[in-house]
């Protein structure tokens, strides 16, 4: 544990670790000496045994960090629940706590049908409950950091998090469906580097203590260049035991060895996944987006899930997406609540129902597609 503080006097840092029954397992202290008005120190503890955190048993310990003034008076206490888990790649296969990791995930936008992107605690609780009920064990925070309480809920519930950095520049390298990166940003443009690194730093520093975060994602659909490579270096240098994810290096193979711990695709066909895994694969494989659930979709989920049993290096993926983005309004004729999408407000141009890709409606009622999700994801609980 590292303690960093700013104070005008020398202080003592204390660390207390308790189990759920409030039994004290560790109690240590460290004198922090002032240097240039900055206090810093590291407390190391050894535990003979711990209960490991995962989706099946999200066991959290109660940690307390204390700061005491020179006279012994208590200046500050920070309580924080922490878990113990290890994620690693061995022989190109990802393991969590020594067991092969299988992702049964979803991409999740923050959405409420009445308040838009301003969601509340009850929305988050409903989403956690829905995920657990339907065998969803992972969430990608597409394509930006979520509200802070969400990460605490994932810690408590055992939901694995791919914490995505707030970055997407889709239109700068894909034009009319074709890959054309001549105007790509951030690319390798020096003026953009500090901006994207600041976003990576914001993501890391805000959420670095959350047990549920297994992966840092560098962003979404922004091609690949020196700037995103620098983001990868930033997270790798933190050596926090997490893995780094980024999809769009697929389009620029010059960076395949320096960006992302995964081979990761979106909407690759099952045979495309197999083609990679059958031809000297370099990295473990996940689908950061698959099963685009627009309309009466989700029928092909089983063909992807079979790959989990066939290839150890295939680790599953994240369905696109969790919840429709639609707005609840009163129907002018019937007076009833109805959900409306792009184009329903005489807005042109519009993407029409393209915001309706969820496995739940915008009012959080489950769609029929959820039955398919519950069944196939349940096979890998």
Which ranges hold each PLM region?
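Generic structural signal for helix capping and beta-alpha/helix-loop junctions
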Residues: 148, 170-172, 223-225, 252-254, ...
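Secreted/periplasmic carbohydrate-active enzymes, especially glycoside hydrolases
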Residues: 1-153, 157-161, 199-200, 214-215, ...
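Aromatic- and acidic-residue-enriched segments that line the glycan-binding/catalytic groove
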Residues: 151-162, 173-187, 233-235, 263, ...
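Substrate-binding clefts and catalytic carboxylate motifs of secreted carbohydrate-active enzymes
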Residues: 197, 214-216, 230-233, 272-381
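Hydrophobic faces of well-ordered beta-strands that scaffold small-molecule active sites
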Residues: 104-106, 139-141, 161-163, 218, ...
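Catalytic metal-binding/acid-base residues of hydrolase active sites
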Residues: 144, 166, 219-223, 240, ...
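Aromatic- and acidic-residue-enriched carbohydrate-binding clefts of CAZyme catalytic domains
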Residues: 104-109, 117, 164-204, 341-353
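Active-site neighborhood of glycoside hydrolase catalytic domains
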Residues: 156, 184-282
């Amino acid at each position: 544990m590292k303690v960093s503080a700013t104070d005008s006097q020398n202080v003592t840092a204390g660390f207390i670790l308790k189990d759920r029954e409030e039994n004290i397992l560790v109690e240590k202290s460290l004198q922090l000496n002032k240097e240039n008005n900055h206090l810093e120190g590291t407390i190391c503890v050894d535990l003979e045994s711990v209960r490991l955190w995962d989706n099946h048993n999200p066991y959290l310990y109660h940690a307390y960090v204390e700061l005491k003034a020179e006279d012994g008076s208590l200046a500050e206490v920070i309580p924080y629940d922490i878990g113990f888990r290890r994620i690693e790649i061995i022989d190109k296969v990802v393991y969590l706590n020594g067991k092969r990791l299988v992702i049964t995930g979803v991409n999740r936008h923050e959405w409420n049908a009445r308040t838009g992107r301003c969601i509340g605690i009850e929305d988050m609780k409903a989403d956690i409950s829905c995920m657990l009920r339907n065998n969803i064990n992972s969430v990608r925070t597409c394509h930006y950091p979520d509200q802070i309480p969400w990460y605490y809920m994932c810690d408590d519930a055992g939901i694995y998090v791919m914490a995505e950095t707030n970055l997407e520049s889709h239109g700068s390298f894909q034009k009319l469906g074709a890959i054309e990166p001549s105007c790509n940003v951030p690319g390798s443009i020096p003026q953009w580097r500090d901006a994207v690194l600041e976003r990576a730093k914001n993501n890391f520093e805000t959420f670095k203590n959350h047990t549920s975060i297994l992966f840092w994602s560098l962003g979404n659909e922004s091609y690949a260049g020196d700037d995103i490579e620098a983001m990868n270096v930033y997270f790798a240098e933190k050596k926090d035991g997490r893995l780094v994810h980024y999809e769009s290096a697929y389009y620029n193979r010059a960076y395949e060895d320096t960006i992302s711990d995964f081979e990761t695709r979106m909407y690759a066909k099952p045979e495309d996944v197999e083609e990679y895994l059958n031809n000297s694969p370099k990295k473990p494989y996940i689908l950061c987006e698959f099963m685009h659930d627009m309309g009466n979709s989700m029928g092909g989920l089983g063909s992807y899930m079979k790959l989990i049993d066939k290839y150890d290096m295939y680790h599953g993926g994240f369905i696109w997406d969790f919840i429709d983005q639609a707005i609840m309004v009163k129907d002018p004729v019937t007076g009833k609540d109805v959900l409306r999408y792009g184009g329903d407000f005489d807005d042109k141009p519009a993407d029409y129902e393209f915001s309706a890709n969820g496995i739940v409606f915008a009012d959080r009622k489950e769609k029929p597609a959820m039955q398919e999700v519950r069944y196939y994801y349940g096979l890998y609980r």
